[in-house]
């Protein structure tokens, strides 16, 4: 599986991987595009989270808090995971991650490593991550 952030520049990466998959006859490769502004695919979670990225980060948080996920001792990753704020947005009120634009206004960079971990945990009908533990 290649789970790709399909938002912005990632869309081009998804296209290239799909072309190479066909060209090289990589029939077992599954390219999974994830648009971080999409709706939450889990119906129950959709009532609590504003978008798929917020939901993915919440899954990451819950897995780490429960001990199912052990993160590396990586100061950049830990910093990215702990500095991004949440807000409540909309009606009914749903949890939403602080936007990357708001992060930039606070002088912070895009949380690329944290997003990569969230993507690595993305189930999206692919497999049950708990079966790997």
Mark where each language-model region is.
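Acidic two-metal-ion nuclease catalytic site recognized across multiple nuclease folds
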Residues: 78, 82-133
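Mg2+-dependent endonuclease catalytic cores in nucleic-acid-processing enzymes, primarily RNase H-like
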Residues: 1-93
